[in-house]
Regions:
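Alpha-helical propensity feature that highlights long, continuous alpha-helices across diverse contexts
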Residues: 1-225
């Protein structure tokens, strides 16, 4: 097994297998990234396009499904476009159209006690006090956080942003945060020796065996003493 090999041979295998491990891991996690991405698109009424992400880097574009954001029924010259939605209008837009879908009531729980020989406790979520950013509300996966972090940061500190900071700027930050995270996970699985070792350690329990010189054993397992 990998663990039984010499340190020198282990390092040779790590160098040889790093790209294969990266590809395998990112193929497994890629669908989770895409699920978070599609859910975010639906939430923000945007669509990512012409995007790519890999070990070398990432790039993306996005567009709005509906732009202008607000249409004036009387005079179209008063329509408000995403790149014009700034300041208090932007905060109100986020507060009314985004935050209700990514927040929930703050969680409260009693310390618990024995009742009828069973340990029980009471819990509830507040209908008044909201909790922001405590979990991953889009899909339940950690990648939600990287999409929503810029929005949550803006919501908490919007007064500190420039007056011309727009919805377009904010959504671009969200996509950039997300694709940067995705790219960095590629780097992690290719560059982090401890992560590669762990994968190789786990693979030995999936019948991945080696000769002493590091070559992969491909014979029948019945022949292994």
């Amino acid at each position: 097994t990998f663990d039984e090999l010499s340190e020198e041979v282990q390092k040779e295998i790590i160098e040889r297998e790093r790209w294969n491990i990266m590809d395998q891991c990112m193929e497994a996690y890629g669908s989770d990234y895409v699920t978070s991405l599609r859910t975010f698109e639906k939430l923000t009424n945007t669509q990512s396009c012409s995007w790519s992400v890999n070990y070398s880097g990432y790039n993306f574009n996005f567009k709005y499904n509906n732009n202008p954001i607000f249409e004036c029924p009387i005079d179209c010259s008063n329509d408000i476009y995403a790149e014009e939605l700034c300041g208090k209008l932007l905060f109100r837009y986020i507060n009314n159209n985004i935050m209700p879908y990514i927040t929930q009531g703050r969680y409260y729980s009693s310390s618990g006690k024995y009742i009828n020989e069973k340990y029980t406790y009471k819990y509830r979520r507040s209908r008044i006090i909201k909790s922001v950013g405590d979990d991953c509300p889009l899909t339940g996966m950690c990648y939600d956080f990287y999409l929503l972090e810029p929005i949550i940061k803006y919501y908490k500190t919007w007064c500190s942003y420039p007056d011309n900071f727009s919805l377009t700027d904010l959504i671009e930050q969200c996509y950039d945060s997300f694709f940067k995270c995705w790219h960095e996970e590629y780097e992690y699985w290719a560059n982090d020796e401890n992560a590669i070792r762990e994968e190789l350690h786990n693979n030995q329990y999936e019948d991945r065996l080696y000769y002493m010189d590091g070559r992969v054993y491909s014979g029948p397992l019945d022949d292994v003493a």
